[in-house]
Amino acid sequence: MLNRTVKEKILKIMELGLEVNSREKNTVFIRFSGHCEIFEVSIHSKGWKEGLGADFFKDIYFGSSSENEAWKKLDEIIEKLEKLKVN
């Protein structure tokens, strides 16, 4: 079960991802698999193009990650999205 802080960070990431995608089509991809507590974010800074990988990718397996490790990864994602939002 995800704790409150993790849920808040995930919601912040979703919000930032939607804001960035409203300016740049197909830039941020976010996936949460609740049945196995996996959260994935991929960012294509210059937009998605077939055959090109993401510039930034993070996946978190909450079931096997320590709380501090998960928070660190979530904070890295938030920082990256906030930079994209400003630019």
What are these regions, as identified by a protein language model?
Residues M1-I38, G47-N87:
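Negatively charged, low-complexity tracts enriched in Asp/Glu with abundant Ser/Thr
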